[in-house]
Amino acid sequence: MERFDVRPRNLEIMARDLSVGNQQKIILAREIANSPDVLIAFQPTRGLDVGAIEYIHLELIKLRDQGKAILLISYELDEILNLSDRIAVICDGCISAEIPYAKIISEKNIKEEIGLHMAGGAAVKG
């Protein structure tokens, strides 16, 4: 609890009665502690304050740097752009675009392009 800065009102409180942010941190701490080869993270920073978001991002980067695979599912485009080495955009249940890291860091209008694909725009080339 200390590592992920979980702050319950008291130590007797049940996890289900914690704030959404503290629940989120406990779930992620539990999964990271298991040192998985693959981590599926759905909205890992939902409900967290700025400091906790930064900490979670650093933990995900550590896992990535250890060679772990992370499937990050998020509605936060900046989060995806900052943490991903490849982005797949899903629209109507199908992958409408797959964008490699080189394009993520080099395209100045990448947010707009991803937004078009999220809305069902044309496929990304290369």
List the predicted regions and their residue ranges.
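Glycine-rich phosphate-binding loops of nucleotide-dependent enzymes
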Residues: 1-126
